[in-house]
Amino acid sequence: MGILGLSKLIADLAPQAIRESEMKHFFGRKVAIDASMCLYQFLIAVRSEGAQLATVNGDPTSHLMGMFYRTIRLLDNGIKPVYVFDGKPPDLKSGELAKRAERREEAEKALKAATDAGDDAGIEKFNRRLVRVTKEHAKEAKELLTLMGVPYVDAPCEAEAQCAALVKAGKVYATATEDMDALTFGSTKLLRYLTYSEARKMPVKEFSYDKLLEGLSINSREFIDLCILLGCDYCESIKGIGPKRAIELINNYRDIETILDNLDSSKYTVPENWNYKVARELFIEPEVANAESIDLKWVEPDEEGLVKFLCGDRQFSEERVRNGAKKLMKSKQAQTQVRLDSFFKTLPSTPNATNAAKRKAEEAKKSANNKKAKTSGGVGGRGRRPK
C-alpha cells in the first residue's frame, strides 16, 4: 500500500522536492531497486514484444523476461542496479496482509462471475488482481541476476527499509520503487517509474527527502507521524483525516500525542488500541542488514549459463539471450566512465543546515547590495544616473 496520498501532498505543497528526468540523467548512479515491486509489474504483463510468457508446462516467465530486458536497459543507460528482496514481513503488517487476502477472495469471486459472463475485460482486470509474487518467482529472479552479474540483497524484513539503509550508508544513490514509504524509512532519494517499460514513455520522477521536509516545514520525526496519519501498512489511520488535514495537524501540534490531546472527538474517531507508537518505532528503527558490511559487485555475465537457464523449457530465443549477454558485457566495459560528482563527497543536508545556508546567502546578498550602493551612489562618486 505504501503511504496513502503522500505523492499528491508533496506535489501540492512541496513541488520543489520533485524532479522529472529521462533515465539517462542517472548515468553512473548505483540504485537499490525494490525487487518484489518489479516482479509484480512484470508478472501482470500480458505480452512482451510478442514473445511467449510461459514455459512448456504453462508456468509464467514474464517476471524473468521483464527482469532480463529491463536490467539490460538500465545498464545500457549507465545505471548500476542492485535488487533488494523482501524478507519476513513485520508482525504489524498482519492486518494489512489480512485485508489483501480478503480482497483476493473478492477478486476470485469477481473473476468467476466475469468468466461465466464471457466478460473479457473483466477477466483480464481480475486476473491482474490475483497476481502475487511467490518465493519461487524470487528464487528464479535471483538465479537470473547472478548469471547476469548483477548483485542482489536479501532483506531480513521490508525491502524498502533495506533500500533506504543502503542509500543512507552511501552505498547507492537512490531507492527505486513505487511505494512512497521508502521516504518514511529515510531514503534521501526516491525514484518512481525507473523500471517502467520504455513503451509507456514515463519520465523518471525523483523525490528529494530534504526538499520535501523543507517544503512541508517539518522534521524527519514529524514526517513519520504525518505518514502514519495518512495511512501506512502497519496500523490503521484516523477516519476523516485526509492529507490536507493531516499536514495541518502536524504543523500545528508537531506529534500524534499532542494531536490526540487536541482532537475533536465528536468529528474524529481514533482506532481502538491504536498502535501508532509501534509503527513509528518500526519506521525509525526498522529491521535491516548492516548496510556498511554489504559489498556490492557488478561482474561479467555468464553467457552460456544464461542460455541454459532461459532457453529450452523457458522458451526464450537463444539469439536474443546471446545478444542480451553481449549488451551486458559491453555495459560492464563501459562502466569505467564515472560521473564527475562521484569524485566529491556530498554531506547529507538537514532542514537546519538548509535554513542556515539560506540565511548566509541572504546576508551575503544584502552585504553586496550595500557595497554596490556605496560605490555607485557615494559622495564624490561618478555613478550612473538612475534610468
Swiss-Prot record:
Report which superkingdom the organism of origin falls in. Eukaryota
Q: Cite the post-translational modification comment.
A: Phosphorylated. Phosphorylation upon DNA damage induces relocalization to the nuclear plasma.
What does the entry list as the binding residues for DNA? R47, R70, E158, G231, D233
Region: I-domain, residue numbers: 122-253
Instruction: Enumerate the residue ranges of region (Disordered).
Output: 346-387
- The record's region (Interaction with PCNA) falls at 336-344
Positions contributing to Mg(2+) 2 binding: D179, D181, D233
CDD domains named among the record's database cross-references: PIN_FEN1
Required co-factors = Mg(2+)
Per UniProt, Mg(2+) 1 binds at D34, D86, E158, E160
State the SUPFAM superfamilies in the record. Answer: 5' to 3' exonuclease, C-terminal subdomain (SSF47807), PIN domain-like (SSF88723)
Q: Which InterPro entries match?
A: 5-3_exonuclease_C_sf, Flap_endonuc, HhH2, PIN-like_dom_sf, XPG-I_dom, XPG/Rad2, XPG_CS, XPG_DNA_repair_N
Q: Where does this chain mainly localize? A: nucleus
Task: Give the UniProt subcellular location, in the record's own words.
Answer: Nucleus, Nucleolus; Nucleus, Nucleoplasm; Mitochondrion
Q: Which ranges form a coiled coil? A: none
GO process annotations (BP): base-excision repair; DNA replication, removal of RNA primer
Q: What does this protein do?
A: Structure-specific nuclease with 5'-flap endonuclease and 5'-3' exonuclease activities involved in DNA replication and repair. During DNA replication, cleaves the 5'-overhanging flap structure that is generated by displacement synthesis when DNA polymerase encounters the 5'-end of a downstream Okazaki fragment. It enters the flap from the 5'-end and then tracks to cleave the flap base, leaving a nick for ligation. Also involved in the long patch base excision repair (LP-BER) pathway, by cleaving within the apurinic/apyrimidinic (AP) site-terminated flap.
Q: Which HAMAP family match?
A: Fen (MF_00614)
Q: Subunit comment for this entry?
A: Interacts with PCNA. Three molecules of FEN1 bind to one PCNA trimer with each molecule binding to one PCNA monomer. PCNA stimulates the nuclease activity without altering cleavage specificity.
- Spell out the family assignment given in the record's similarity comment: Belongs to the XPG/RAD2 endonuclease family. FEN1 subfamily.
Q: What is this protein called?
A: Flap endonuclease 1
The record lists the organism as Drosophila erecta (Fruit fly)
Lineage of the species this protein comes from: Eukaryota, Metazoa, Ecdysozoa, Arthropoda, Hexapoda
Q: Which gene does this sequence derive from?
A: Fen1
